[in-house]
Amino acid sequence: WHGFQHGIGLIGHAAPLAYLLKSNLVYIASSFTSKDAGKVPCASDPTIDNFVRFANCQTIHDGYEFTRQDKIRNITKYAIGQNKPIELRVCWQSSGGKNCCKCEKCYRTIMGILAEEGDPNSFGLSYKKEDSHTIKKFIKYKLKMNSVSVAYWQDIQQRFLENQDIK
């Protein structure tokens, strides 16, 4: 999926809706950054996505300059500064429209928000302080790391090191 049809598949899903809404622009959020170029085989890349056009619509591969942790930092900072909760939907495991808060992507997002001094509960992710033990066990015993997940978790780890005064 990632190496061949990721971007075009997502854009293909957006095309009928863009047509119905008479939209001339579709944004696809970046999965990786320019520093990841060539390291991770992914068919969702600005050199491909930005050239996909259909009907009167063009595609913009957005946020390529930001890591996932940078994006979490920006969202967290905005939500705290504006005193507005923002419900994120990051989970692909849950079929009910909410985050399961038990999968790798939910855990990664929870930890990323905590690293930015945010409260995951304000972002649609259920979290209690004692959940950190469950997450730690998951990372240690169940998580199968690959080149992609290692980079994401290292960014989170780096933010915790930078924000050592987090309560």
Feature roles, as predicted:
Residues 1-167:
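Nucleotide-activated chemistry modules centered on ATP-dependent adenylation/adenylyltransferase
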